[in-house]
Amino acid sequence: MKLTVLSKEEIEKIHHTTLKVLNEIGVAVRNKHALELLKRHGFKLDGRGDVVRFPKEEIEKTINAFSNDIDIYDREGNLALKLGRNKVYFGPGGGAPNLLDLQGNRRPSTKEDVAKVAKICDALPNMDFVMSDITAQDQPLKVQDLHELEAMILNTSKPLVPVCLGNGHFADTVYRIHQAVHPGDAGVGKPFIILYFQPSSPLQLDKEPLSRLLKAVEFNIPLIISGAMTAGGTAPVTIAGALVTGNAEVLAAMTIARLVNEKARIIYGVGGVAMDLYTGNFCYGSPELGFLSGVAVGEIAEYYDFATWGRGACSDAKVLDAQFGSEVFMNAIIPALGGVNLIHDAGRIDFGKSGCLEALVLADEIIDACRRVIRGFKVDEEHLAFEAIKEIGVGGTFLSSRHTLKNYKEELWAPKLFTRLDFTAWINSDKKDIEQRAHDRVEKILKEHRPKEVDRDLQEEIHRIVMEGERAVLSAS
């Protein structure tokens, strides 16, 4: 099934307005190496020092350079994610400073908590890639990202998208870890780590993220380039205007990436949120998220033929209540029906300021239901079921028919966490609510699940690379 909200004419209006912004207003490029690269290729500055005009012809070269056909592997070297049209995958987010822990306390998160997130996601069937969800607040600020990466690698074999706080040193570390895990793969032919670049709205590409971008595309590491504009704050309050702002930032950054490596594996995103103008909070649970990070972004990316990154299955709720369930389903189904390839932030709560292990488990269940909706249903001879109707006839039951036995598992979604007991049966059972059942599932995974193990020598090598990366970052600061 597919959801659309924009006509081709509307997408073209967004595109042409984006071209006007890039050519007439420009984007600040606050990295001397990126500026020198642009100057060598004939780009003009507008007289303010670092604001670059991006002409239409160069943007068209960028659009034509990159493909939506990107393969991502797991740590073991197996194909895990095949990006392209209507390929939809989910994963958690990253960067939350707090954890709503298993005792119900909201506290600063730790490296050990990140390891638990990775282990939980490794066990959850609908978490297709892994981010840290939270941050290693017990590590030095400038190298928290390195420690989060180490914790994830050792606790899941799924593809990783680490949140990076630093500069090109992080890309160096990622490349070295890839070489340690897959010796001889100098060209990163089977990438299991995707790096992340985020502009600063409105219309700014900052020094450290650009250093990371330049290194990533040089090493041929897949790179997400995603805006993070806030409608009503760092971008126009109108959805179309916010999309134009984010699109301009992302196409400018993609153009810089192209000048380094025309065959770079770039994943396009806008990733915007709406601001609540009454509280000043950035809303992860708003219906507008479905446009700013979901279906509209998917349609624009399809117009360009780019692989896509978006946001969804997240909530502004503080606990696992009715608001959480409502917002997570709303913001999972919209980007998924829009064909966004990689949908992150699953299970995020509290405006993205907190993580919660039980929330990941509950989001996984909701995503599973969403996938049933996305899959739709078949209309063919077998599924029209004329012969079954004829066999059962008037007034019969299909409960025990061969047709039901053959097709029910494919047709009817069965929950793993939600209950379908009637009230009497529920009263006579353990009477646990959804939060308690999610808690039990977390406890069971942490106790029983065994991710594919990294052998001891490789663990030590990864730790050595991380510590060398830490020293490089701290000595440069």
Model-derived features: where do they sit?
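Hydrophobic alpha-helical scaffolding
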Residues: 4-8, 24, 48-52, 107, ...
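Catalytic-core signal marking the mid-to-C-terminal active-site face
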Residues: 4-17, 25-37, 52, 358-477
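N-terminal glycine-rich anion-binding loops that anchor highly charged ligand groups
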Residues: 9-13, 26-40, 46-48, 82, ...
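Glycine-rich, N-terminal phosphate-binding loop and its surrounding beta-alpha-beta segment
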Residues: 36-105
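Short acidic (Asp/Glu) and glycine-rich catalytic loops that position anionic groups and cofactors
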Residues: 39-46, 230, 274-278, 308-312, ...
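Helix-rich catalytic cores of soluble enzyme domains
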Residues: 108-337, 341
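Hydrophobic alpha-helical bundle architecture
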Residues: 294-400
